[in-house]
């Protein structure tokens, strides 16, 4: 496990763990922030309750500040039937969405070489153009990019080829955050981490991150990097939503302990928390779930309806929409550095950007927690029987 140096101790005051909640103290020496209220790894700078004010949070244990709401380019391109269901955004529409994001304070744009066979990266690069230097770009490698035996995974060979191809498509000389889009059990971890460390030393990557790792995958990767003094993962891109809370069982405590920030993908539960799905009503014809439901997380209808009912009630109390309430709940969760928004049009994007600049009350958060709780699997149900010595993060 990573130890804390004396220098770090002088900068960051202690935090204590009461019965089942983490209580975090203010960081000394932090300028421009009224409070530190999410986690020790989240730098929360908000300007009151101004709905147009973006928050900027530290990305894990790094010094990089990312907007609390970021933009995901998986809707760009529509390269195959799966991605067409997500969106078919072209360069012109992408430019409008990006301008809206930048005007709203968004500084992080996420893509992957596997999105629409690289077309997403191409469109993002063209749409950003000269604005690229004003923002951060995150991309990923792991999924197949060709038919060859080495056109996939995270081997040294594939990562080198994949990174160079991504840089070319994006029209940039470096990637700000480079994710391993999945864990490659066939490649030694030291080979992966050594390759990523070299990319950072070469200036082609600034920060590295994981995505969709199990707890032991992430911890072993961090341990290998620490052993050799290599650059370590500062973030983990994860699926997390009101109807998908498994992240809280193992990965969230790991993120707290190791200062690994969460970049949340599909924060609206694979399209289920858009407000269009209601109890007793058929699935809307325009829903992408008709084509993608079998590839995403599964859940019982009654569970989903209970969560939507709770969201609907709180939306009525706050004057917000169901997606805005669902996103605001996530913004208050431990370890969350940024929520990646996906949108096919400006109306969707504007609505989602309205999740910032206000907060649900503790009572409203508790109501959503209750409606969305699920029975944990082993060993987590056993651990929760005695939280005194192993407190829960939420």
What role is predicted for each listed range?
Residues 1, 10-42, 46:
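Short, basic, low-complexity termini and linkers enriched in Ser/Thr/Gly/Pro
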Residues 247-286, 321:
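Aromatic-lined glycan-binding groove of carbohydrate-active enzymes
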């Amino acid at each position: 496990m990573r130890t804390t140096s004396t220098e770090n101790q002088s900068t960051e005051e202690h935090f204590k763990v009461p019965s089942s909640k983490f209580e975090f103290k203010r960081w000394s020496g932090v300028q421009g922030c009224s409070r530190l209220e999410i986690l020790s790894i989240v730098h929360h700078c908000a300007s009151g309750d101004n709905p147009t004010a973006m928050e900027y949070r530290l990305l894990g244990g790094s010094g990089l500040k990312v907007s609390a709401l970021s933009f995901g380019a998986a809707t760009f391109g529509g390269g195959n039937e799966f991605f067409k269901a997500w969106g078919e955004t072209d360069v012109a529409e992408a430019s409008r969405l990006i301008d809206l994001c930048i005007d709203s304070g968004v500084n992080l744009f996420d893509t992957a070489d596997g999105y629409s066979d690289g077309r997403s990266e191409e469109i993002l690069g063209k749409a950003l153009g000269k604005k690229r230097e004003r923002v951060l770009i995150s991309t990923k490698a792991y999924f197949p990019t060709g038919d060859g035996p080495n056109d996939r995974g995270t081997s040294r060979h594939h990562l080198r080829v994949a990174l160079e191809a991504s840089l070319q498509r994006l029209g940039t000389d470096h990637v700000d955050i480079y994710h391993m889009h999945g864990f490659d059990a066939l490649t030694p971890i030291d080979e992966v981490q050594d390759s990523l460390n070299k990319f950072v030393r070469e200036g082609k990557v600034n920060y590295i991150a994981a995505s969709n790792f199990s707890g032991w995958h992430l911890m072993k990767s961090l341990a290998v990097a620490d052993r050799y003094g290599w650059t370590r993962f500062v973030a983990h891109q994860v699926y997390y939503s009101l109807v998908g809370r498994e992240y809280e069982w193992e990965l969230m405590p790991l993120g707290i302990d190791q200062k690994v920030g969460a970049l949340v993908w599909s924060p609206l539960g694979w399209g289920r928390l858009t407000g269009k799905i209601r109890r007793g009503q058929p699935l809307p014809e325009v829903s992408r779930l008709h084509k993608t439901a079998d590839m995403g997380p599964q859940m019982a209808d009654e569970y989903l309806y209970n969560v939507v009912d709770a969201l609907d009630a709180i939306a009525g109390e706050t004057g917000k929409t169901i997606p805005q309430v669902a996103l605001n709940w996530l913004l208050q969760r431990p370890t969350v550095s940024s929520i990646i928004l996906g949108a096919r049009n400006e109306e969707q994007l504007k609505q989602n950007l309205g999740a910032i600049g206000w907060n649900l009350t503790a009572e409203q958060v508790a109501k959503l927690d209750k409606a969305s709780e699920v029975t944990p699997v082993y060993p987590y149900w056993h651990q929760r029987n005695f939280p005194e010595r192993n407190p829960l993060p939420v």
